[in-house]
Amino acid sequence: MTTFEGSYDGTGMRVGIVCSRFNEFIVTALLDGAKRGLSSHGVSESSIDVVWVPGAFEIPIATKAMATSGRYDTLVTVGAVIRGETAHFEYVAGPVADSIAQIQLETGMPIGFAVLTVENVEQAVERSGPGAGNKGEEAAIGAIEMANVLKALR
């Protein structure tokens, strides 16, 4: 029996990060976590590109452009969709997640998903803080692992 597992070594990897400007104070903290996760696993800062888009709804199109560019080994998506008093949350959160999953399947590009979908600002702050549990950091480390898993399988 052969077992495939990805390592957490990002040395030499090129990584693209797509960030939503909406709820920027949360997204910036998630981005800091993603960059921390990448650098602590061997990805050099000069090998990281960050693209800012207006809101979470625009994340998929920028992500697909990066996934098909041939420049990256893996990508990370970063955003924060916070439930409000309208149905906007439902129209954005699900389609963004579905689109990112579809981009992975269509392109073979592993994509770490750090687009928070939370009920309130307090939950967003809990998931984007500087300590353990920063979802940006977790997504970035997962993206490195998946890039290595897929490399081993190809």
Show where each model-derived region lies.
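Structural motif
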Residues: 16, 49, 73-75, 109-115
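Generic secondary-structure signature for well-ordered alpha-helical cores
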Residues: 24, 36-44, 64-71, 101-105, ...
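Glycine-rich phosphate-binding loop
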Residues: 58-100
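Glycine-rich phosphate/diphosphate-binding loop of Rossmann-like nucleotide-binding domains
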Residues: 2-54
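Glycine-rich oxoanion-binding loops at beta->alpha junctions
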Residues: 51-69, 116, 120-121
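Short, ordered loop/turn segments at secondary-structure junctions
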Residues: 21-22, 80-81, 116-120
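Amphipathic, non-transmembrane alpha-helical secondary structure
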Residues: 28, 32, 60-64, 68, ...
